[in-house]
From Swiss-Prot:
Tree of life domain: Archaea
Catalytic activity: aldehydo-D-ribose 5-phosphate + D-glyceraldehyde 3-phosphate + L-glutamine = pyridoxal 5'-phosphate + L-glutamate + phosphate + 3 H2O + H(+); L-glutamine + H2O = L-glutamate + NH4(+)
Active-site annotation: C84, H184, E186
Name this polypeptide is given: Pyridoxal 5'-phosphate synthase subunit PdxT
Amino acid sequence: MKIGVLALQGDVEEHANAFKEAGREVGVDVDVVEVKKPGDLKDIKALAIPGGESTTIGRLAKRTGLLDAVKKAIEGGVPALGTCAGAIFMAKEVKDAVVGATGQPVLGVMDIAVVRNAFGRQRESFEAEVVLENLGKLKAVFIRAPAFVRAWGSAKLLAPLRHNQLGLVYAAAVQNNMVATAFHPELTTTAVHKWVINMALGRF
């Protein structure tokens, strides 16, 4: 199974390793391709969009032609996993905890509202246990994490967390062929990557 990892920024290698390990666990041979230009999306069965800095990812994707190409692939049914900044990049509505509306380039494929830097900057990074109803309890690493605050359409918010200022927020979301996490599953677990592989296999 050919799986792409958007390689504009972020922990590309960790996602590649997580997909390979997840593939072994479900009995699928995974070939990971670094996606740096639209042609790299050819024949991929799933795609990961790693963390990094969401504004930079958006600008680079726009400049390389990947913004439209990735959007088309996801809207065409390719299962996609967006983590941290990658999740922000997938959201239709993005605000910053400090500056408000950002106007940054996004894919806008998921019916979710996201608050960037909801838990503060790098020094407020933390670990927590989250519950994803279909995957159970997961150890989650949050690094300058966003929070998911609203969903509409067929999108569903998962992994509830209590936030000091925002109240009840969520650390994950799912909609059709898309999964978004505010945390970095590639650092602690293969469960989320297995979920995406199973989506590609038609098991979810």
